[in-house]
Every structure is written in structure tokens, then in C-alpha cells.
């Protein structure tokens, strides 16, 4: 029903009528990527493409979260069911109703979890730190409401490491690198 509803949400009304891009509040990534997606600096209503794109991005996010948390384990059907709330929770379903903003909100979530894909326990993780800085900046420049996702995933991974009885020093190094990368990315 969301794809077929063809109803403009609050922010969509002005964009449909005037075609402006101004996502505001420092959302430069959203402004620039919207030029690529819409093929012009003047936005036109290309829904339901934007909603479908947001759904696809959230599906990718769900798979990446499973890969991050399960590491090398095989993904089973109950893991997929457990990951469904990532893209289908009631709080994010509202975001799909924004015809113009939905893909950039989903991208912000992708930017928030992407650094963990590059975290490897066996190396020095310079790539993890650099990608954390870049992805945190991109998250903040696309949709700042996703700012709490990175710290929460950091906590989940640290608790998982603790539960797996890993060395406390490794856990602290992971947390410190995550905090440093996150803070630098926000600055």
C-alpha cells in the first residue's frame, strides 16, 4: 500500500510543486546524491523508485548486520526473520512515506553500519578507523537521526566479544578505535 498510495508527505509537497532540493540541516550528501538519482538539480517526482531504492538499501543493511554479527556463521532462515525489524520496524516505516527523503534516510543507516564490515580482529584496523571517520561524516551529512546506530552496534559487538570470552584488551581497543573514529567523523 505504501508504494501504491501516491500521497505526498509534508516535505514532499514543496518538492513536487517547486522541485527544490534543499534537504537542509547540513544534509549535503542528500542534496548531491539527489542530483544523481533524479538526473537534475530540479527534483521531479520519480516515486515509487525512491521508495523501492530505500527498501533495497535497507535489505542490504539487514544482510550486512547479519554478516557483522554472525561473522563466518551460515545465515539461516531464523536469522533473516530476526533481521526483518531493521527495515520493517514501525519507526522506520514512516520514513518510507517520504517520496524524496526515503533513500537518503536509508543511506544514512547504511553509512552507520558499513565501518563494521571492515573491522577485522586480527589486524591493526587502520582501514576500520579511516572508514569509520568517512562513514560517520557521510551519515551526519545525509540524515543525522541515524547517529545513534553506530554506538549501539559498537556496544553490541563489544558485548558479543565479551560473551565469546575474548581478551579484554582487544575489546577495549575496538571500543576506543570506534569512539575515536566516530568523534572525528562528527567533527
Task: Describe the role of every protein-language-model region.
Residues 128-144, 149, 155:
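Membrane-interface alpha helices of multi-pass inner-membrane proteins
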Residues 2-10, 37-40, 88-98, 162:
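Juxtamembrane "helix-exit" motif on the non-cytosolic side of transmembrane helices
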Residues 112-129, 161-166:
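Membrane-interface transmembrane helices that cradle and orient dolichyl/undecaprenyl
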Residues 2-15, 21-33, 143:
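Extracytoplasmic catalytic/substrate-binding loops of multi-pass membrane glycan-assembly enzymes
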Residues 21-52:
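Short hydrophobic/aromatic helix or loop-helix immediately within or flanking a transmembrane segment
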Residues 23, 27, 54, 77-120, ...:
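Membrane-interface micro-motifs in multi-pass membrane enzymes
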Amino acid at each position: 500500500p505504501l508504494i501504491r498510495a501516491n500521497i505526498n508527505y509534508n516535505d514532499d509537497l514543496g518538492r513536487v510543486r517547486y522541485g527544490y532540493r534543499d534537504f537542509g540541516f547540513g544534509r549535503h550528501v542528500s542534496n548531491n546524491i539527489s542530483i544523481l538519482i533524479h538526473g537534475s538539480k530540479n527534483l521531479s517526482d520519480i516515486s515509487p523508485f525512491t521508495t523501492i531504492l530505500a527498501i533495497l538499501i535497507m535489505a542490504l543493511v539487514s544482510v550486512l548486520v547479519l554478516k557483522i554479527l554472525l561473522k563466518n556463521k551460515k545465515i539461516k532462515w531464523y536469522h533473516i526473520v530476526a533481521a526483518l525489524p531493521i527495515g520493517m520496524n514501525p519507526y522506520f516505516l514512516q520514513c518510507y512515506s517520504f517520496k524524496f527523503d526515503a533513500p537518503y534516510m536509508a543511506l544514512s543507516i547504511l553509512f552507520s553500519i558499513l565501518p563494521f564490515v571492515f573491522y577485522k580482529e586480527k589486524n591493526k584496523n587502520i582501514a576500520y578507523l579511516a572508514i569509520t571517520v568517512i562513514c560517520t561524516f557521510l551519515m551526519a551529512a545525509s540524515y543525522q537521526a541515524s547517529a545513534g546506530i553506530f554506538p549501539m552496534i559498537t556496544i553490541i559487538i563489544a558485548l558479543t566479544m565479551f560473551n565469546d570470552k575474548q581478551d579484554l584488551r582487544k575489546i577495549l581497543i575496538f571500543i576506543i578505535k570506534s569512539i575515536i573514529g566516530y568523534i572525528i567523523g562528527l567533527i
